[in-house]
Each structure stands twice: as structure tokens, then as C-alpha cells.
A protein has these predicted regions:
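Bacterial Sec-dependent N-terminal signal peptides
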Residues: 1-25
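Low-complexity, acidic/polar, glycine-enriched regions of mature
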Residues: 20-184
Length: 184
């Protein structure tokens, strides 16, 4: 009887572990270019150090990007970004917490491209806003990539842009995110 109970307990534990599958990655890349003329890269920046988690069973996703990991071609711009605009000592991270709509775990078992949407909350510069954007999920081999493009307005996140710089920047800043999860 003990062996049957032990086997049943082990079986339930394994089933729960499989169903509660969670993927984690440190391969989350975020790029933005706030220039009015997108061909100019004066203020463009990228972080390749975001961390993301995907809970397969619940379709929940979370992303954390340390703001000091955004690097610019100009050291002075990077200093202004961290100290004067984003106040990264006070607000060190940008985050997203939400769910993927149109996602199911069976999609991870076969190569393909799937159009999903994400809905949740973005926190940037200490301000949290509701967020919704389309997401392209690409499953290929032993990895899944989530690509998302969206725009934000600096003033929506209480980010003050000085008058001298403001004419050079777009009202809405385009942001591109690419998150790659290894499928183990």
C-alpha cells in the first residue's frame, strides 16, 4: 500500500512539474530610437541584459530591464539619460508583468510563427501604466522568440525632456523588444 501511495504522490508531483513549466532567460534585448528622424541614431540605445520569465500554464510573462544597461554612442548622452531623464539611481529598472493572449503550450512543440498579444502593466521611472501590444512568437528548433514593437510617450511616465533636446525627439518613442527563451 505504501508503494502505491508513494508512486501516486510521485506521479502527481511529476504531472504538476510538467504542467507548471517555467522558462527563464537573460536574452531579452530592448532597443529604442527617440529621434524624430529615425535614420539618425544620435539618441538610440540598446540593452541586451533584460531578464524574462514565461509561465507556460498560465501564459504569464514578466520582464525586467536594468536601466543602466542601456548604452549610447556618446558617454555624455548616457550620463544625461541615467542622471537627468530616467533617474536610474532612484528607479533602476523597467518592468512588464502581464499575460499573453492567443498562447498555448502546444505551440511550443512545433516550429512556426504565431501572432499573439500581450496585456499587463509597464513600470518605468516609478510610473505604472496599463499596456497592450501585439507580439510575434517564433518557435524554431529548441528556442522561442517573442518580438514586440510599441511606442511610449515620455510624459506618460513623468520623464521630463529639456527644451533644448525636445525638438529633436519624437513625441512617441518606438521601442523594439526581442526575447529569446531556450526550450529545454
Amino acid at each position: 500500500m505504501k508503494k502505491i501511495l508513494l508512486f501516486a504522490f510521485f506521479f502527481i508531483l511529476v504531472v504538476n512539474l510538467i504542467n507548471a513549466q517555467t522558462y527563464k532567460t537573460r536574452d531579452a534585448n530592448i532597443y529604442f530610437n527617440p529621434n524624430k528622424d529615425l535614420s539618425h541614431k544620435d539618441y538610440a540605445s540598446q540593452s541586451k541584459e533584460g531578464t524574462a520569465v514565461l509561465k507556460v500554464e498560465t501564459s504569464e510573462v514578466a520582464l525586467l530591464v536594468p536601466m543602466k544597461t542601456f548604452h549610447f554612442n556618446n558617454a555624455l548622452l548616457e550620463e544625461h539619460f541615467n542622471e537627468n531623464y530616467l533617474h536610474t539611481n532612484k528607479f533602476p529598472n523597467a518592468t512588464f508583468k502581464g499575460k499573453l493572449t492567443g498562447f498555448n503550450k502546444d505551440q511550443l512543440t512545433k516550429d512556426g510563427i504565431y501572432n499573439l498579444s500581450s496585456e499587463g502593466q509597464v513600470t518605468l521611472h516609478g510610473v505604472t501604466k496599463d499596456f497592450k501590444a501585439p507580439v510575434k512568437m517564433t518557435v524554431k528548433g529548441k528556442s522561442v522568440t517573442f518580438d514586440c514593437s510599441f511606442k511610449i510617450k515620455a510624459e506618460d511616465f513623468a520623464i521630463d525632456i529639456p527644451g533644448l533636446v525636445k525638438p529633436k525627439l519624437a513625441d512617441l518613442t518606438p521601442i523594439d523588444a526581442a526575447i529569446v527563451f531556450p526550450l529545454n
